Structure formats: structure tokens, C-alpha cells
Curated annotation (Swiss-Prot):
Cofactor binding mode and count: Binds 1 Fe cation per subunit.
Subcellular location: Cytoplasm; Endoplasmic reticulum membrane; Golgi apparatus membrane
Organism for this UniProt entry: Xenopus tropicalis (Western clawed frog)
Protein name listed in UniProt: 4-hydroxyphenylpyruvate dioxygenase
PROSITE patterns to which the protein is assigned, alphabetical: VOC
Pfam families given in the database record: Glyoxalase
């Protein structure tokens, strides 16, 4: 595991502030938004569709504290772009939007360094105010929207959006999701494509390396991965980039790439200030989490006896809820991962709480991999690499 201190070049003007929102392209935006509200504690915050004058695409925006997800679906049969995207990828994250200062400058800098432009800067406005956007291509079919508020914005979400048409009376009766903000967003790459993507972020967005692990550190009996985390100068946006490494069997990173059809967003980590309450509440709402074996907690108890930090939470409760712990000499983190959010074994979510710890759970990767491999095996996807490069199921 490596942590980096060199922040590299700072933008002469403008800066990346934070994650703003995520856009999912899905087959049925209304149902997808309702699922995340019911299961994770989001609430509808804005809508754009036929009733608001949007004739081609419907958008349902949902919010929990500082987290905003937007679910979009095509309204007409002829939408080839969205239709082909869903045939190839299934439901998934299409766009990761960053709030920025000086969109024009950051966009031009990225363009000058070779970034593929999806859409040049443009402005949208309504009675709430003005917002400037630009869109760049990143890994796979995923994009980044640069979003700049041109003065205070007083609308419900962004120009063109209106109040939700319906507020489900079920939602106020359910326990809080206790989720606060996007901690990090992980992108999975095919083999040998991690470093070029990391270099794209460094060159085009002036992000820098923050943390990394290689396959010598992250492996199970069967599979392994490499990961490099990139971040903006202010270190408010964290983007781990993963790739599979050669192993005896297909890794869960390769399984993702096979089923998604390309590189894409593997998981979204949501930060909480009370993971025990969050996990209890999310389980009661019907969220399925991966399960760590009891041997993990037996080993953890042994290791913590000689650790320089003290875990405040009751280890028996963490074990009961299957929450994982990672630590160093200065602090620790608590994390847990959901099962995939759709039938394809692609996107899943993470819930994470940090105590002066800025890593990404390297100490838990082996346990996480083994838990995923159990499910992978049940799907018939824990396959052996054959000499001809094909996969064989035992």
C-alpha cells in the first residue's frame, strides 16, 4: 500500500469542488428512483419529464443529505444512444458530475491535453438561476459533467427541473438511511488499462495519485487486483481506479467488465457518521449486504490487542452486522458492501465511516474478495483461465 504526498500541478484558475450528482441510465427511471428511496432512505427532490416539457428523456432526482442520484430513461422508442447503452451495460452510472469553479478554463485545459469532448460548455437557466455545463468522456462509456453555478441557484435542483410529481407516503414511516455524502466512486477497468486512465486524470483534470495497492498486497487464493486512487488538488473528490490481475480464476473485477461490457463505475461509497445505525436501518429496509465469516472477527480481535488505536464500537455488534474494520497507527475505518443493485453482477454500494483514516480498506480487500467470490461461484462465474484464454467452469 502506498500513500502519495505530491499533489502535482495546481490549476492556474478554477478548481474542482466536490461530487455534485450521479446520473444513472436505466430502463425505468421511476421504478429505479423508487427502489433507492425505499431501500436506502433517499427522498424525491426534483423531476423532469413530459409534464415539464422534456419530450425525449425523463429524469427523477433523489436526495439524501449531500448525495444526489438522477435516474434517466428514454421516453421514445427511437432513442438509439440510451437504448444501445442499456442493451450493452444494463442499468448503471452514465455520468459522474463535479461541481467546479471556472468551467470554461477547466474544460479548455482538459481539451488541450487530449480529453474527448462530449459537449462544449453551454448555459441553462430558469427562474432559479443560471448553470454552466460541459461534458468530457472518461473510461468506457462513462462521462464527467463539469457543473458551475453562475451565481446563487434557488431552484429545486438544476434548471428545467420541477418539484416531484408524487411523494410516497411510505417513506416517512421508514427509518433513516443515515447516509451523508459520496466518499468515493470506484471505476473498474479491463486488464492493463488502469495506468492509462490514471494518467488521463493526471493530465486532463490535473488530479494526482493519492493511494495505491498492487496484486501482491490484494489477493485471495484465486484472484487479485491492482488499484490506484486519484484525487483533485484539494482532495475532496476521490476516484479509485481498479484493474484485474492474473490469478487462477476470474476476479470480480473481470466479472464486472464482462457483464458491464466495458470499463465503468463498479461501486459508490457513501459516508455515514453512524455506521451501526445506518446498517441496522438499511437491513430493516431490505438491503442485502455481503457477509464476512466469523474467522475474520477472531483474527481482528487478536490484531487489535497490539494495535495503536482503539475501536470505539462494540466488536460483537460489528460482527453481528458483518461490518469490516481497517486501521493504521493513526485511525480506522468501518465499511460494508451491498450485493449488486441489479441482476447483472455490476454496480454495488458501500457504506463507510472514517475515524482519522484516509485509506480504502486495503486490509479488508481479501475478506471482501472472498465474500464476493462466494456469490461469484454461485453465479457460475468463478471460472478457471484456460490456456486458450477462455474461461472454464469446474
Amino acid at each position: 500500500m502506498t500513500s502519495y504526498t505530491d499533489k502535482g500541478e495546481k490549476h492556474a484558475r478554477g478548481r474542482f469542488l466536490s461530487f455534485h450528482h450521479l446520473t444513472f441510465w436505466v430502463g425505468n427511471a421511476k421504478q429505479a428512483a423508487s427502489f433507492y428511496c425505499d431501500k436506502f432512505g433517499f427522498e424525491p427532490c426534483a423531476y423532469k419529464g413530459l409534464e415539464t416539457g422534456s419530450r425525449d428523456v425523463v429524469s427523477h432526482a433523489i436526495k439524501q443529505d449531500k448525495i444526489i442520484f438522477v435516474f434517466q430513461s428514454p421516453l421514445n422508442p427511437g432513442n438509439q444512444e440510451m437504448g444501445q447503452h442499456m442493451i450493452k451495460h444494463g442499468d448503471g452510472v452514465k455520468d459522474v458530475a463535479f461541481q467546479v469553479e471556472d468551467c470554461d478554463f477547466l474544460f479548455q485545459k482538459a481539451k488541450d491535453h487530449g480529453a474527448v469532448v462530449v459537449r462544449e460548455p453551454w448555459i441553462e437557466e430558469d427562474e432559479g438561476g443560471k448553470v454552466k455545463y460541459a461534458v468530457l468522456q472518461t473510461y468506457g462509456d462513462t462521462t464527467h459533467t463539469l457543473l458551475e453555478y453562475l451565481g446563487p441557484y434557488r431552484g429545486v435542483f438544476l434548471p428545467g427541473y420541477k418539484e416531484p410529481l408524487f411523494r410516497d407516503p411510505l417513506l416517512p414511516t421508514l427509518p433513516s438511511g443515515c447516509l451523508s455524502f459520496i466518499d468515493h466512486i470506484v471505476g473498474n477497468q479491463p486488464d492493463n488499462e488502469m495506468v492509462p486512465i490514471v494518467e488521463w486524470y493526471q493530465k486532463c483534470l490535473l488530479f494526482h495519485r493519492f493511494w495505491s495497492v498492487d496484486d501482491k498486497q490484494i489477493h485471495t487464493e484465486y484472484s487479485s487486483l491492482r488499484s490506484i486512487v486519484v484525487t483533485n488538488y484539494e482532495e475532496t473528490i476521490k476516484m479509485p481506479i481498479n484493474e484485474p490481475a492474473a490469478g487462477k480464476k476470474k476476479s470480480q473485477i473481470q466479472e464486472y467488465v464482462d457483464y458491464y461490457g466495458s470499463a465503468g463505475v463498479q461501486h459508490i461509497a457513501l459516508n455515514t457518521s453512524n455506521i451501526i445505525k445506518a446498517v441496522k436501518n438499511l437491513k430493516s429496509r431490505g438491503i442485502e449486504f455481503l457477509s464476512a465469516p466469523d474467522t475474520y472477527y477472531e483474527e481482528l480481535r487478536k490484531k487489535l490487542k497490539t494495535a495503536k488505536i482503539t475501536v470505539k464500537e462494540d466488536l460483537n455488534v460489528l460482527q453481528e452486522l458483518k461490518i469490516l474494520v481497517d486501521y493504521d497507527d493513526k485511525g480506522y475505518l468501518l465499511q460494508i458492501f451491498t450485493k449488486p443493485m441489479q441482476d447483472r453482477p455490476t454496480l454495488f454500494l458501500e457504506v463507510i465511516q472514517r475515524y482519522n483514516h484516509f485509506g480504502f480498506g486495503a486490509g479488508n480487500f481479501k475478506s471482501l474478495f472472498e465474500a464476493i467470490e462466494t456469490d461469484q461461484d454461485a453465479r457460475g462465474n468463478l471460472t478457471i483461465y484456460a490456456a486458450n484464454g477462455e474461461h472454464q467452469v469446474l
